Amino acid sequence: MKKVLIIADLQHASPRIPSVAKFFPEFGWEPIVLTGHPPEAEDQTFRVILTPFPDSIVEWKKRLFMNPREGFQKQLGVPFSMREKKWSFSAMLINLCRGIILYPDANKKWRRIALEAANELCRREDIDAIISSSSPVTSHLIAQEISKKWNIPWIADLRDLWTQNHNYHYGHTRRFIEQRLELKTLKTADAIVTVSPLWAADLEKLHRLNNIYSITNGFDPDLLYAKKNDLTSKFSITYTGPIYTGKHDTAEFLSALSDLVTKEIIDRKDVEVRFYGPQDELLQQQIERNKLTDIVTQYGLIPRESSFKKQRESQLLLLLYWNDPEVKGWYPLKGFEYLASQRPILVTGGTGGDVVEKLMHQTKAGLYCRNRMEIIDRLSQLYLEYKEKGRIDNSKIDINEINKFNYKNAANKFTVILNDLIKKRG
C-alpha cells in the first residue's frame, strides 16, 4: 500500500481531512497525518504524528498580562456593539498588529517543529505523496520544503482560498505581500485542489496553472443511513452551529417569522425555532425585538452527535448563507450535514446563482430565499403543508444525488489525482 503524508492542523481542518483520510486505505493509500493538535475523535483509523507547538496569540496575550482565553477587544473594554465593526479604531489597530505578528498565520511556530518530524518520517519510511491542507497556510510551506527535499509529489488542498478569500482579514499591503508568497509557494505544487468549481476558476485566473481541481466537502456516508428519528410534533425549525456576526443575517428570517405570527398565518403555539450553538448576544436582541421569546430559543452548544439527532428530528432546517456576491463559490459545511439528515432545508441570504442554490436544485433538498418576502412566501407554504399532513414531506429529496457528496467519493477523487501524479513521476 502506498503512503501519503497529510500535513494539516486538525484543530482547523474541519471534518474534511479526517473524514477523507479514513477512506484512503480502501483505494490503496495509507494516510499518515502530521498535525499540531490532536484529532477530535480518539478512535481514528489512521496514524497521527502529533507535533505540539506554542500558540502565538496566547503567547502575546500572556506578554501583555491578558487572559489568553478571552478576545483582545473584550479585555480592552471595547463595547460589544463596536467589536464586529471592521473599521472601528480598536479593530483596525488589533488587525494591524495581528497582520505583522502573525505572518503568514498563527501557526508560524509549527513550521520548524513539523519539518523536523516530517524529515524524520521520510528518513524512516518511503512516502509516496504529500497532501497539505489549509488553513493554516503554514501547512503548504511545510509541504513545499518536504516535497523539494525528498522529491515527493505534492497536492495543495485549499479548503478556503488563500489571498482571494472573501473573509480575508488584512489590508491591501499585507494582501500584496502575501499574494507573492502564495504564488511562489503553490507554483511548485504538482496539483492544487479546492472545494468548489467557482473557486477552482478563481485560482486558475490568479495562478495561470492547469493542474487545479475541485473536490467538494461532504459528509460521512454513515450519516445518510443512520437510524431515522421521529419528527417533532411541532413545526420545528432548527439551526446547528455558530452564527458569524456580520456574515450570517438572522434579522430577515426572524422578521419574516414575526410577521407571519403577528398576522396569525402561523399559529405561534405550533412553531418552535431552535438554535444549537454558542450563545449569540445579537441574535438574542433580535429575538426580543421581534417578540419571539416564546418561540425562538438558543440552547447553547451540544455534542456533534446530538446535533445530528436534532437535525434528523426537525421538520425544517435553517441554513444561513452570506449576502455577499463574492462568496458564490462557497459551500457551507453545515449544508452537507443537513443533506445527510434528509430533512427539507430553508436557505436564507445569498444573491442567487451561487453553488448553494445549485446544490438545492440538484438534490431537491431545499428552498432558496433571497429576501424577506421570499422567506415569508416559503414559510407560509411549508406551514400549510405541515398543517395538512402533520409533517413536512421529504419524499422528493434525491438521495442518489445527495450520496454523490459523501466523503468516500471525495477520498476516491483525491486518490485518482495521487495515482496520476505517481504515474507522471515515473
At which residue positions do the language-model features occur?
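N-terminal subdomain of nucleotide-sugar transferases
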Residues: 1-65, 191, 212, 416-419, ...
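Nucleotide-sugar-dependent
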Residues: 11-12, 248-251, 305-310, 317-336, ...
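Membrane-proximal helix-turn-helix segments that form the acceptor-binding/catalytic region
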Residues: 20, 101, 138-141, 145-149, ...
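A conserved catalytic-core segment of Leloir-type glycosyltransferases
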Residues: 35-112
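Acidic anion/phosphate-binding donor-loop and adjacent secondary structure
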Residues: 58-60, 219-234
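Carbohydrate-associated surface elements
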Residues: 198, 215-218
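Conserved donor-binding/catalytic core segment of Leloir-type glycosyltransferases
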Residues: 230-248, 254, 410
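Nucleotide-activated donor-binding/catalytic signature segment of Leloir-type glycosyltransferases, i.e.
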Residues: 268-277, 282-308
